[in-house]
Amino acid sequence: MIGSLAGAFAFGTVLPVPTGSTATLGRGVMTALPGVGIVLGAVAAAVLWAGSWAFGPHSALAGLLAVAVLLLATRGMHIDGLSDTVDGLGCYGAPERALRVMRDGSAGAFGAASIVVAVGAQTLAFSMLPGGWSGAVGVVVAVTAGRVAALVACRRGIPAAEGSALGGRVAGTQPAAVVLVWLAAVAALAIPATERIWQGPLTVVVAVGMTALLVRHCVRRFGGITGDVLGAAIEVTTTVVAVGLVIR
């Protein structure tokens, strides 16, 4: 378990985890990925708190700093995956052409727009979270829920897209029980994130459900999942949860 958690940090962050202490990327590492989300969320929550202290409550700059820390801590690979996935979904042609577009490396109009929307929405939503403990929990919930969505994308029965090295190693590795346990845990964690005790859990479940539909569409369009699809699942879910938690 320690090796899987270390592998999850090596895969999902810029932390210099010694390779000898990590498990090979696969089922165990992906199962531990939401644990990485808890730590990343706590770091982002601390930055949000410090920014709110420096710039005033509900400062958009504080929210932007929290998002920037997440991007730096993950090498921007998830937001890049979102951009590539949106570009792939936005092109015409066979799955092979869509996969070529995704592997091109440059961001098209759709991809660039998706980055702006995701970063902007997360920034504003984080800045609108209540101060104190509830707001910190909200950030942790949003970031962790994104990693739970990655497990949804890797659940049993989901294939890898042709030629996807990462997809081939993680697709279909997560039993439904693992996904449900993590989903229930994050939904429970979300209870104190809002004044209405049902809003947080409902937001988490709805966001993960929406991402499951996105993943299903990606499987139809691309023939399976890729690393980019995992990044898109993480960013979409994080954004939807963050926005859902600040609905009045």
UniProtKB/Swiss-Prot annotation:
It comes from Mycobacterium sp. (strain JLS). The chain crosses the membrane at residues 1-21, 35-55, 59-79, 101-121, 123-143, 171-191, 197-217, 227-247. GO terms for biological process: cobalamin biosynthetic process. It is an enzyme of class 2 (transferase). GO terms for molecular function: adenosylcobinamide-GDP ribazoletransferase activity; cobalamin 5'-phosphate synthase activity. Its EC number is 2.7.8.26. Pfam families: CobS. GO terms for cellular component: plasma membrane. Keywords: Cell membrane, Cobalamin biosynthesis, Magnesium, Membrane, Transferase, Transmembrane, Transmembrane helix. Belongs to the CobS family. InterPro entries: CobS. Pathway: Cofactor biosynthesis; adenosylcobalamin biosynthesis; adenosylcobalamin from cob(II)yrinate a,c-diamide: step 7/7. It catalyses: alpha-ribazole + adenosylcob(III)inamide-GDP = adenosylcob(III)alamin + GMP + H(+); alpha-ribazole 5'-phosphate + adenosylcob(III)inamide-GDP = adenosylcob(III)alamin 5'-phosphate + GMP + H(+). Joins adenosylcobinamide-GDP and alpha-ribazole to generate adenosylcobalamin (Ado-cobalamin). Also synthesizes adenosylcobalamin 5'-phosphate from adenosylcobinamide-GDP and alpha-ribazole 5'-phosphate. This is Adenosylcobinamide-GDP ribazoletransferase. Its cofactor is Mg(2+). It is found in: Cell membrane. It is a multi-pass membrane protein. It comes from the Bacteria.
